[in-house]
């Protein structure tokens, strides 16, 4: 399956159903009164963390997600059915961004509210009072929340395997876990992160084989920054370095990898780290190992020839890796989305664009909400709409701009001539 770790999508929650204008009409019931029912809630959109997924490919193929609309109200004070909520599985480690701000970090197998469905509109039964016992007033359902989101996947791994291309990372992952990554004797065999579950005694942890890093990776060279971000999730780092092959310089390789990690995110250097010195069966190994120990005396090193490693060597590697996690307990910051707090900006209730030919166009989030909510299907609703826009100062502002009788006014889809 194709690995996709970044997509942009649009989510549109369901619109609330419209309230209706209705009056009770039954035999032998004189002046039955208003009985228009309310609209149902629009369906919301949820993301659900799924440990069985490891790619955002489904979103790459489906760029828009629409919620189900609520049903309109019915006579006899019947409320319309709510729109069905949508639950969409996403890989654990998915981050959700709205206008480049992180609003949700999906790290648990639970549901996260992404876009809330619109409230259903009120039917005329709700507008009855002692002065108006037969109101011809109703409301449309509110639009569901509509967001353009960026999704970014950072794999959920406890330990990240890093190193130069063809250093032996994929071989190591295949030995310690149930993963079967592609292994070959050429650079950049691993083109996407590979995950494996490592079992040790009664415990287990997840290890990620990340594509080989080269000098300049933090600036986009090679596999580059595309996959460096996946290391940020890890709690520990294991460097796999070729100590035995000709023309290899383990000291230089280690310094370059650490430098790229630091340039990308300085906090990565605070993680527990060990080095697996690979290819101990080759002639250059002992010379390179001695030089490395002199240069980095405090670095923990595990000697191995991964391609011919025995089971007891593999068990030692697994124990050392698990020890890195025991030293530093897992700390996860969980930030859940709360889209109900993402409100429309009402600081500018409307914007008037006027033209020389007597045409005035009105836009703005507040005026859009008003005209969307109040259906202009009765004289009382028109009067209610008029009172709302007068209250926010729209009519006064049009007069200041020199509007004349007969001029055309457009408020989104609604047009009328000024009188």
From Swiss-Prot:
One of its GO terms (molecular function) is GTPase activity. Residues 1-156 form the Obg domain. GO terms for cellular component: cytoplasm. Its cofactor is Mg(2+). Its main location: cytoplasm. It holds the Pfam family DUF1967. Belongs to the TRAFAC class OBG-HflX-like GTPase superfamily. OBG GTPase family. Residues 342-419 form the OCT domain. This is GTPase Obg. Keywords: Cytoplasm, GTP-binding, Hydrolase, Magnesium, Metal-binding, Nucleotide-binding. Monomer. GTP binds at residues 163-170, 188-192, 209-212, 278-281, 315-317. GO terms for biological process: ribosome biogenesis. It is found in: Cytoplasm. The keyword Repeat does not apply. InterPro entries: G_OBG (IPR031167), GTP-bd (IPR006073), GTP-bd_Obg/CgtA (IPR014100), GTP-bd_prot_GTP1/OBG_C_sf (IPR036346), GTP1-OBG_CS (IPR006074), GTP1_OBG_dom (IPR006169), GTP1_OBG_dom_sf (IPR036726), OBG_GTPase (IPR045086). Mg(2+) binds at residues 170, 190. CDD domains: Obg. Its EC number is 3.6.5.-. Residues 157-334 form the OBG-type G domain. NCBIfam families: Obg_CgtA, Obg_CgtA_exten, PRK12297.1, PRK12299.1. An essential GTPase which binds GTP, GDP and possibly (p)ppGpp with moderate affinity, with high nucleotide exchange rates and a fairly low GTP hydrolysis rate. Plays a role in control of the cell cycle, stress response, ribosome biogenesis and in those bacteria that undergo differentiation, in morphogenesis control.
